[in-house]
Amino acid sequence: MNYYTTKEIQERVDSYISQFKEGYFSPLSLMARMTEEVGELAREVNHYYGEKPKKASEQEKTIEEELGDMLFVLTCFANSLEIDLSQAFEQSMTKIETRDKDRWTRK
């Protein structure tokens, strides 16, 4: 199994997308794709943990697969807007760690 840094993920996706004339989709199209992938993830979570089992005719997918699809689309979105996901993550974690430091009961 390979493990990638966020930089490596962004570079691999960019290398893949750069092969094609069309390049990255527009931000609005990527947002629609992200929404589609979130819906597919929700469906899988509902099948595994909710009250709605899969039909016998439904294709077997996993939560892991859907999370991977979301990561791909998220990376496309970030790349198309020239956003470094490591920096975006650092900004978010700093905000969350400051804002929520006393919100939860510590172990």
Predicted regions and their residues:
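Flexible "arm" and connector segments at domain edges
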Residues: M1-L67, L71-K107
